[in-house]
Curated annotation (Swiss-Prot):
Disruption phenotype: Deficient mice completely lack skeletal muscle and die immediately after birth because of respiratory failure. The modification Phosphothreonine is found at residues 25, 35, 101. Residues 25-60, 95-130, 131-166 form the EF-hand domain. GO terms for biological process: muscle contraction; skeletal muscle tissue development. The lineage of its organism: Eukaryota, Metazoa, Chordata, Craniata, Vertebrata. This is Myosin regulatory light chain 11. Keywords: Calcium, Metal-binding, Methylation, Motor protein, Muscle protein, Myosin, Phosphoprotein, Repeat. PROSITE patterns: EF_HAND_1 (PS00018), EF_HAND_2 (PS50222). It comes from Mus musculus (Mouse). One of its GO terms (cellular component) is myosin complex. Myosin regulatory subunit that plays an essential role to maintain muscle integrity during early development. Plays a role in regulation of muscle contraction. The modification N,N,N-trimethylalanine is found at residue 2.
Length: 169
């Protein structure tokens, strides 16, 4: 009986290890991100969930090879624990500015360094910790979009991690 207990405990530590890497707020934010990606709400992120997520971001022609490569990053089905583990491994030792910039880059498949104001505003007001209209107004005052309606997310990332706007050269 003792060996079973020890075995169970070791297994539990293995799965709880990933949860000890993040605080409760971070885990909740990852859970919200997981829920956004898990489009069919079955508790598993699959290829169709990824395709639907890209479509929701305006990227309609994602190649199967690209989706397959993403799915192969996991050793099996991507439930929340696997999702959290994958991010834990990627974020280990990462610079916070790089992490935040990387999150924005997902929304910028063309690598322009900008995203559409309308799209960002929709995300911020409809997903996860929703921004109020006052918060949106303050954001656009701090980070005004250009004449084409594009927002420079690299500057946003810099301010989030350093507190001051980067000098424009």
């Amino acid at each position: 009986m003792a060996p079973k207990k020890a075995k169970r405990r070791a297994g539990a530590e293995g799965s709880s290890n990933v949860f000890s890497m993040f605080d409760q707020t971070q885990i909740q934010e990852f859970k919200e991100a997981f829920t956004v990606i898990d489009q069919n709400r079955d508790g598993i992120i699959d290829k169709e969930d990824l395709r639907d997520t890209f479509a929701a971001m305006g990227r309609l022609n994602v190649k199967n090879e690209e989706l397959d490569a993403m799915m192969k990053e996991a050793s099996g089905p991507i439930n929340f624990t696997v999702f959290l583990t994958m991010f834990g491994e990627k974020l280990k030792g990462a610079d916070p500015e790089d992490v935040i910039t990387g999150a924005f880059k997902v929304l910028d498949p063309e690598g322009k360094g900008t995203i559409k104001k309308q799209f960002l505003e929709e995300l911020l007001t409809t997903q996860c910790d929703r921004f109020s209209q006052e918060e949106i107004k303050n954001m656009w005052a701090a980070f005004p979009p250009d004449v084409g309606g594009n927002v420079d997310y690299k500057n946003i990332c810099y301010v989030i991690t350093h507190g001051d706007a980067k000098d424009q050269e």
